[in-house]
Amino acid sequence: MNPYGNIRKVPLDYEGIKSTAYAVQRQELDNRRGLEWKECGIVGSNYLLVPNSEVKELADEIATESQLTWEPMKTFFNGKQFAYFMQCKSDTTEIAKDDDIALGMAFWNSYDGSTALQFRTFLVRLVCTNGMITKDFMNLMKFKHNKTSEGYEKQIINAAKVVDNCGDDVEAVAKRMRRMVETPVSLNDLAVLRNSTLGHLPVTLWGKISTHFLQKESSKILDNDVTMWDFYNACTDILWHDEKPTMASLEHNQVITDKLLGAMA
C-alpha cells in the first residue's frame, strides 16, 4: 500500500442532490485492473486534505535544515492514517551502561479526519530501536484539518525548530527512565499495575506483553533482579515491532509511556 499515492476530494450527491459531504479517495495500483480510486473517508466541505507526500517532504526539509543528523526510521500507513518517524543519529543520552536513548521526531496525518495533522518529538532506545511515544513529556503540536490550518507548512517548520533545543526535555525524561532502572518489579507488582495504572489495556495486548516479559526476563525474575525499565521495554518491544501495526499500537505506546513515566516523579 503506497502512502504517497495521489489523493482527491470528490463531492457526494444522491439522485442529483448535492451533499455537503465529500469522499476522500486515494489512487492505488491493482495488479489486474491497474490504477484505481479507492474511498478512504467521508469529510466535510471545509476539510483541509493534506497529502502524505507533502508531510514527508516537510519532514525531510526540517531534517535537512536541523543542526542534528537525522535518518528515516519507520513509516506507518493503513490506507487512512499515516505516521512518519525519524531518528537523530548525532546525539545520545545514557540511561544505563550500554543502554542509550536518542531523540526522534514524528509527523502524523489522516485522510478521514480521525487523526490530526501533527508534529511531535519522541525517544528511541538504541539497543533495540524501540520507539517510545509520549504526549505528556515531549513536544506535540496539532493542526486541525480545516482553513485555520492553511499555511501549516510554515507553522510546522517553526514548531519543529524545537528539535535543535530538546536537550532539557530529553534529560528530564532520561531521569525518569533511570528511576525505572532503579525500581524493582515483582510479579505482585505486575498484578497491581494490571489492576490500576495499566487497567485500560485490552486483555490480548496485556497477554502479549506479560508473556514477552516473562520469557525475555525469566532468569532475572528468578533472581529477583528485574526492574520497571525491563517491563517497560517489554511493552515497547511488542508495540513498536508489531508485525501488523495499527494506529492503536501507537496510541497504546503513548499511554503506557506516559503512565509509567508519570509514576517515576
Positions of PLM-derived features:
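A broad "ordered helical/assembly scaffold" signature
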Residues: I42-V43, N78, A160-V162
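Glycine-rich, compositionally biased intrinsically disordered regions
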Residues: N52-T69, M73
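Beta-rich nucleic-acid/ligand-interaction surfaces
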Residues: W70-D91
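Intrinsically disordered, low-complexity regions enriched in serine/threonine
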Residues: M1-K18, K74, K89-A265
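Feature for intrinsically disordered/low-complexity regulatory segments and propeptides
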Residues: M1-L58, E243
